[in-house]
């Protein structure tokens, strides 16, 4: 399951590669994207508690000859899937036009009139580190998160941490202030996070985690609703949207399960500072 997920991620990244940086044609990248989608479906089937799997092992085996002969494959793809990469890097100013369906797993709807959250304690954000010659600092602007029940979240905020492969903190943990507003299926933050370590000093395999938390009045505690993460090879200037995973937060990235099949993401914008 984990290997299927990993392979899917690598294929998704290759499918998104700019033409100049890829050895594949656009048609081949489309096929690679479809294979990645199938791997995600297989991973989801393995994690499903239902007896009937949506994507069987026999189906998975049909992909092997396609992947082995990707440079010469010119037949119709055996499965009706779309090559939609889970991580889509948006061009500056590009707008998303996504239709949101109701999620079967969680009740309630987030659509409604724009609303603002009350002023609260301003989180635990830290200032940018001093610059060093030849070293790169990263600012991540958390713009918004897409959730079907965004309108029902009380006092939502995001905890940001940087972990190594063993889940050990590499920098101080930071909490954003409570979100600035909610609108339709989005919770808006528009807040900058200053990474508390130069990018070049991060260990291999490190990842930046974003845990979305909200208050549950019935249980009287703050709960993690979902999380997302960004790996080191995804540190690039500009916008990026990353997928959301079900809690509990898996800092070791070994048993990941998508929050929903719907097009709901965490929207970020990265700025690199180098002397």
Curated annotation (Swiss-Prot):
The ranges of region (Disordered) come to 97-125
Q: Which GO terms describe its cellular component?
A: membrane
Signal sequence interval, chain numbering: none
Under the subunit heading, UniProt states: Interacts with AXIN1.
Q: What InterPro entries would the database entry show?
A: Aida_C (IPR025939), AIDA_N (IPR023421), AIDA_N_sf (IPR036818), C2_domain_sf (IPR035892)
Entry keyword Phosphoprotein: yes
Going by the entry's taxonomy, the superkingdom of the source organism is recorded as Eukaryota
Whether S-adenosyl-L-methionine counts among this entry's keywords is no
Q: Where is this region: Axin-binding?
A: 123-190
Query: Family assignment?
Result: Belongs to the AIDA family.
Give me the stretches of Acidic residues compositional bias: 97-107
Cite the entry's keywords alphabetically.
Developmental protein, Phosphoprotein
Cite a single Pfam family from the UniProt record: Aida_C2
Any idea which GO molecular function terms this record carries?
phosphatidylinositol binding
One GO-annotated biological process of the protein: negative regulation of JNK cascade
User: What is the recorded function of this protein according to its Swiss-Prot or TrEMBL entry?
Assistant: Acts as a ventralizing factor during embryogenesis. Inhibits axin-mediated JNK activation by binding axin and disrupting axin homodimerization. This in turn antagonizes a Wnt/beta-catenin-independent dorsalization pathway activated by AXIN/JNK-signaling.
As stated in the Swiss-Prot or TrEMBL entry, residues carrying the post-translational modification Phosphoserine are: 113
Q: Which residues form the C2 Aida-type domain?
A: 126-273
Name of the molecule in the record: Axin interactor, dorsalization-associated protein
């Amino acid at each position: 399951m984990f290997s299927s997920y990993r392979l899917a991620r690598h294929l998704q990244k290759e499918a998104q590669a700019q033409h100049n940086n890829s050895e594949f044609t656009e048609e081949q990248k489309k096929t690679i994207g479809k294979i990645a989608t199938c791997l995600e479906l297989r991973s989801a089937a393995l994690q499903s508690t239902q007896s009937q799997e949506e994507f069987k092992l026999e189906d998975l085996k049909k992909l092997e000859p396609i992947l082995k002969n990707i440079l010469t494959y010119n037949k119709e793809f055996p499965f009706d899937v779309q090559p939609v990469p889970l991580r889509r890097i948006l061009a500056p100013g590009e707008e998303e036009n996504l239709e949101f369906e109701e999620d079967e797993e969680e009740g309630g709807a987030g659509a409604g009139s724009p609303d603002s959250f009350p002023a609260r304690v301003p989180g635990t954000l830290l200032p940018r580190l001093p610059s060093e010659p030849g070293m790169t600092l990263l600012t991540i602007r958390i713009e918004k998160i897409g959730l079907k029940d965004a309108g029902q979240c009380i006092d939502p905020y995001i905890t940001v941490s940087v972990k190594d492969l063993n889940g050990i903190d590499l920098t101080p943990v930071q909490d954003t202030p409570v979100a600035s507003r909610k609108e339709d299926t989005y919770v808006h933050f528009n807040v900058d996070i200053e990474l508390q370590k130069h990018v070049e000093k991060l260990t291999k395999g490190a990842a930046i985690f974003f845990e979305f938390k909200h208050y549950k009045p019935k249980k009287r505690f703050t709960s993690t609703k979902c999380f997302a993460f960004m790996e080191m090879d995804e540190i690039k200037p500009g916008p990026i949207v990353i997928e959301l995973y079900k809690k509990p937060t898996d800092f070791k990235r070994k048993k990941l399960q998508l929050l929903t099949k719907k097009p709901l993401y965490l929207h970020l914008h990265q700025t690199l500072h180098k002397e």
